[in-house]
Regions:
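PLP-dependent aminotransferase class I/II
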Residues: 20-21, 118-204
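Substrate-binding/gating loop at the entrance of the active-site cleft, primarily
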Residues: 11-28, 157
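Phosphate-binding glycine-rich loop
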Residues: 1-8
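Helix C-cap/helix->beta junction micro-motif
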Residues: 26, 86-87, 116
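Conserved PLP-binding catalytic core of the aspartate aminotransferase-like
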Residues: 184-185, 195-232
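Active-site phosphate-binding strand-loop segment of PLP-dependent enzymes
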Residues: 31, 39-101
Length: 234
């Protein structure tokens, strides 16, 4: 974000507050394009493109998204990024949760970095590899000029030897990758099935390691559900 120094940013929301915080340091204006509940929080690409006509130069997407657990399919991403390329809009896609998607290849934008120079994809080890304390992340872009400029301004010693060693071991541990996907995806499907049996909840399609619910019982709050989970009632 600092290297791109955007002037007018659109954020696909609701989502992390950290994007907004980082943008505040760069001086960019920022607005949200909110996913709609009536669409199960899936993106209307054509509608978003109409909004992007209003002079934005930077677009931020979390895919799969937190907190909706919804995802944008790769073909829709291609259409969106191509539109942005024609409008000189740079697209940043955070794929922190992509390893939890039922079909990673259907969701990831990484292959699109070979097609578009206005794209950067971010990933990390905090969620799937359960290592938030490592503070280890990486970016993928096909824009060599942009990459060179980022390297010029890279903080010295931004990756320590422990992080480099652990990160390599994590990303090459294919057995962990397979077993973790089997466990999380299996448990998520089981949870979705059981929750759908309860009329008090509306269950939205999930692509991350969490499920978004709408409470449909009058007087029942999220705090009540939380306490029921803690004491084993639910």
């Amino acid at each position: 974000i600092q290297e791109r120094a955007p002037k007018h940013t659109l954020i696909l929301g609701p989502t992390y507050s950290e994007y907004s915080r980082e943008l505040s340091f760069s001086g960019s204006t920022q607005e949200y394009y909110h996913l709609q509940e009536e669409r199960n929080f899936t993106l209307d690409v054509d509608d978003l493109c109409k909004i992007l006509e209003k002079g934005y130069d930077f677009l931020i997407i979390c895919n799969p998204n937190n907190p909706t657990s919804s995802a944008i399919m790769q073909e829709d991403l291609r259409k969106l990024i191509a539109f942005c390329a024609g409008k000189n809009i740079f697209v940043m896609i955070d794929e922190t949760y992509v390893e939890f998607a039922p079909d990673i290849n259907a969701v990831t934008a990484v292959p699109l970095t070979r097609e578009f120079s206005n794209l950067m994809v971010l990933r990390g080890v905090s969620k799937f590899y359960a290592a938030p304390g490592m503070r280890l992340g990486y970016g993928i872009t096909g824009n060599r000029e942009f990459l060179a400029k980022m390297k010029e301004k890279q903080t010295p010693w931004s990756l320590n030897s422990l992080g480099a060693f652990a990160g390599k071991r994590m990303l090459l541990d294919h057995d962990y990758f397979r077993r973790t996907r089997e466990l999380i995806l299996g448990e998520r499907d089981r949870m979705e099935t059981e929750l759908k049996k309860l009329p008090i909840f509306k269950v939205y399609p999930a692509y991350a390691n969490f499920i978004l619910l709408k409470i449909q019982k009058e007087g029942l709050t999220s705090a009540d559900v939380f306490e029921a989970c803690i004491d084993g009632t639910l």
